[in-house]
Amino acid sequence: MSNDLPTKKDLVKWDQEDALNWTRGEYEIPNSKACGGEADGKAIYFCGNSLGLLNKKARQHIMEELDVWSTSSVTGHFNHPYQRPWKHVDEPLTPHLAKLVGAREEEVAHTSTLTSNMHNLFTSFYQPTEKRWKIVIEKGSFPSDWYAVHSHPRLHDKVLRPEQIDNAIIALVPREGEDTLRTEDILKVLDDNKDSIAIVWLPLVQYYTGQLFDISSISPKVHEIGALLGLDMAHGIGNVECKLNEWNVDFAVWCTYKYLNAGPAAIGGFYIRSGLEDGGRRLAGWWGNDARTRFHMSPNFQPTPGAKGYQHSCTPVFSSIPLLATLQLIEAVGFSNMVEKARRLTGTLEALLKASRYYVHPADPKGKIGFKIITPAAPYRGTQLSLVILPEEEHVMPKVFDRMLRKGLVGDERKPSVIRLSPVVLYNTFEEVGRAVEIVEEALEEEEEERKR
C-alpha cells in the first residue's frame, strides 16, 4: 500500500470526525445473514443505487398512515391528525423535490413511475415531422428507456413513413475500446444530424457505468439544433447536484427508491420546463385538473398550470409518504454537504481499490483474475463505482458476487460482468469502505485459488 493511503485507524478517525455521522442512526441497516451472508450482524450495504434503506421515521410515518386509515378511513383524505391529508399528500414533498432538482415548484410533479412518466411526457413533447423525427439515446441505456423510446415513433405512422420509423433512433456508442461516452462525440452526432433530431434523451448518471454526463455542455448544442433535451434522473436525484433550470433541460423523470429511500417501486416524479408547449397533446386525468375545481366533477378539463397539470390519478399515499423522511433529512443536512462527503467516500473507495493487487491496469496481460473500474474519475460520477470482474470472457462475476454476499458486502450485479458498489453518505461509513475493499480482495483471492486446483 502507498503511504498516502488511509489506514484502518484513519478511516475510523474520519468517521468520528464526520459532521454527518449521525445520519446513519436514522436508518435501519440490513442484517448480513438475511442478505445472504454467512454470519449475523449488520451488512455492509453498498447498494443504495438500486434500493435505498428504510429511514426510521419513514417506518413511523407509514404506521401513522395505517392508523389514520384504520380510525378515519375515507375522511383521512380531508381531516388528518398528522396534518398530511391524503388529498394533498404530494404538497409537502414538492418544495423539497423542486430544490433537489434545481427547478421551480410549478415545474415539478410527484406521481406514477419512471417509465410511465416517460411515456406521458414523450406523448406530449415528441412531435415528429417529416423532416425532424429522430431520437438520440445511448445504446447502453437502461432497457426500459430503450424500449419506451423505440415505441414512440411507431405511434406516428400517419406522419412517418415505415423507413423513417425504422431509422428513428440514433444510438450513441462509446469509441472502440472505451466504456463511456465522450462529450465531444455526443456533440458531433448532434451536429451531423442537426436537421433531423427531435429529442435527445440521456441519463444524468448512467446506470451501468456510473458516468455523470456533462449536461451543461450538451444542452446548448441540443437547443442550437432545434431539438428538445430530456433526462432520466433515476441515478441522479439525491446523488449528484441537479440544476435543471440552469442547464435549460426541457423535461426529466426520476424515481425515488434509490438515493431518496422511498421504498421498493415507490412513486416517481417529473419536471417540465416552464413555457414548454405541448401543442395540445396531453394525456389528461382528473388529478391534472385544477385543484380548485377538481372535485366539482366537471366534464371540462381545466389543467393545473405547470407540471402538475400532467398528472393523471391521485397520489399513492403509501409509496409517497416514506419519501418525506429522507427529504427532510437532506434539508437538515444540506445537500452540498452530502455531495462533499460523497466525493470523499467514493474517492476513498476508488483509491483503495486501485491500490489492490487485483486492480487490473489496461497494460496488464489478459486473463488475469481481478477487476477494472469503468466509472469515470471525479467529477464525472456520483457515488457509484462499477467494477468489471475479469476475465470477462470466463463469466466469473456471479461467483465473485456470491462470495462477496457471503462475506457481508451487499453490492449490485449487472450482467454480463459488472459489480456496482455505491457507498451512500446518509448511512455508509469510511470504515465500511475499507472493509468492502478487503472483501472484494478476499472474494477474488478465493477465485484465484480455485483456478489453481
UniProtKB/Swiss-Prot annotation:
Top-level taxon of the source organism: Eukaryota
Listed Gene3D superfamilies: Aspartate Aminotransferase, domain 1 (3.90.1150.10), Type I PLP-dependent aspartate aminotransferase-like (Major domain) (3.40.640.10)
Location within or outside the cell: Cytoplasm
Modified residues (N6-(pyridoxal phosphate)lysine): K258
This protein's pathway: Amino-acid degradation; L-kynurenine degradation; L-alanine and anthranilate from L-kynurenine: step 1/1; Cofactor biosynthesis; NAD(+) biosynthesis; quinolinate from L-kynurenine: step 2/3
Molecular function (Gene Ontology), one example: kynureninase activity
GO biological process: 'de novo' NAD biosynthetic process from L-tryptophan; anthranilate metabolic process; L-kynurenine catabolic process; L-tryptophan catabolic process to kynurenine; quinolinate biosynthetic process
Pfam families hit by this protein: Aminotran_5, KYNU_C
Sites where the protein binds pyridoxal 5'-phosphate: L114, T115, F142, P143, S144, D145, D232, H235, Y257, W286
GO CC, any one term: cytoplasm
Keyword Transcription assigned: no
Recorded catalytic activity of this chain's protein: L-kynurenine + H2O = anthranilate + L-alanine + H(+); 3-hydroxy-L-kynurenine + H2O = 3-hydroxyanthranilate + L-alanine + H(+)
Quaternary context: Homodimer.
PANTHER family membership: KYNURENINASE
Family designation: Belongs to the kynureninase family.
The protein's name in its UniProt record: Kynureninase
